[in-house]
Amino acid sequence: MPYPHQVVIVIPVYKPFPDPEEIRALRRAVSVFSRHPIRLLGPDDIDYSVYLDAGIDRCSIIQMPGHHFRGIKAYNRLLCSKGFYAIFDVFEYILIFQTDAWVFRDELSEWCERGYDYIGSPWLWRPERVKNSQILDLWPLMKGRVGNGGVSLRKIKVMKKYALLARIFFALTAKNEDFIWLLVSLLPGVRIKKPNADEALKFCIEMEPEEALNRTGSLPFTVHAYMRYGADYWKAYMPD
């Protein structure tokens, strides 16, 4: 079925006063993604003046009840719900682009045209939250797989198709939504088409930037959590 629009960029926010680096990254995203529709998604009980000043159009703000943004658990629950993806039904793809992400150049249409159902940075290095897990070691399930959700391109009809499974896993585990979607993708009979780790690394890098760039040989489309993982390293590749 043809879609009226190929892709929408959704930037989730939860606070009225983002830090200066988040504003810088947001201005960059608005500039680089200028030919694509951008939606700021946030609670209905905050002031958006700072985001408007950063270049977001008031008509591009989608406000939802505040309880969806009160904590990581609430946000994870939202991104496991069919209703969330249904908001964007006129689009084939949704790019989740969190405020701690940076885009180097606009390759969004090209990534959509590759036909994957889900693309995110691969888990090649053990994240801190997994290192510190005292109850259950999730790393064997994650290692080498594609799925980080901070910058992730998702085919909306596929997310809606499997959202009930995601909600069930979330109710059982309350883990991060990107890990929930990984569990769903590993179920027998579930088909969520993803690139391999090397291809996904060209879409987005999160951890170990120097090692990741040595592996890819070129700058990725985006980076996520760059202030946490390699802020000084990435400065050389970002305009002042």
Model-assigned labels for residue ranges:
Residues F17-P20, D45-Y51, L108:
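Short, charged/polar "capping" segments at the starts of alpha-helices
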Residues M1-R27:
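N-proximal low-complexity "stem/linker" segments adjacent to membrane-targeting elements
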Residues G144-D240:
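Catalytic core and acceptor-binding pocket of nucleotide-sugar-dependent glycosyltransferases
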Residues F91-V103:
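Short beta-strand-to-loop acidic/aromatic patch adjacent to the donor-nucleotide binding site
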Residues L41-E92:
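Active-site-proximal specificity loops/subdomain of glycosyltransferases
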Residues I38, T99-D100, K155:
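Generic structural signal for small/hydrophobic residues in well-ordered secondary structure
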Residues W102-D137:
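Conserved donor-nucleotide/metal-binding helix-loop-beta segment in metal-dependent transferases, i.e.
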Residues A25-H36:
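Short, acidic, metal-binding catalytic loop of nucleotide-sugar glycosyltransferases
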